Curated annotation (Swiss-Prot):
One of its GO terms (biological process) is photosynthesis. Belongs to the PsaG/PsaK family. This is Photosystem I reaction center subunit PsaK. InterPro entries: PSI_centre_PsaK_sf (IPR035982), PSI_PsaG/PsaK (IPR000549), PSI_PsaK (IPR017492), PSI_PsaK_bact (IPR037101). It holds the Pfam family PSI_PSAK. Keywords: Chloroplast, Membrane, Photosynthesis, Photosystem I, Plastid, Thylakoid, Transmembrane, Transmembrane helix. Gene3D superfamilies: Photosystem I PsaK, reaction centre (1.20.860.20). The chain crosses the membrane at residues 15-34. It is a single-pass membrane protein. The gene is psaK.
């Protein structure tokens, strides 16, 4: 495949800024909150050293933040293409 064709089809993305960081943080927090209540089998792996999150360990944290990053990247690309993030 011609690399120039691939490069020409990549959309313009906004550079890293405070707006981009806030969108990513918000998406990750929403995914963690949703995962806290949606994950049925919890606490099978090692726990994280944070008080008040009994039963929400490292595997759950990695899973929810992975989902949060996927949602955040899609949100940033979408908001960038619409023009709401510069």
């Amino acid at each position: 495949m011609n690399i120039l064709f691939v490069l020409s089809s990549v959309p313009h993305t906004s550079p890293w800024s405070t707006q981009v960081a806030m969108v990513m943080i918000t998406c990750n927090l929403l995914a963690i909150v949703a995962g806290r209540y949606a994950i049925k089998v919890r606490g099978l792996g090692p726990s994280i050293p944070v008080s008040g999150v009994e039963g929400f360990g490292l595997p759950e944290l990695l899973a929810t933040t992975s989902l949060g990053h996927v949602i955040g990247a899609a949100s940033i690309l979408g908001l960038s293409n619409v023009g709401l993030i510069s």
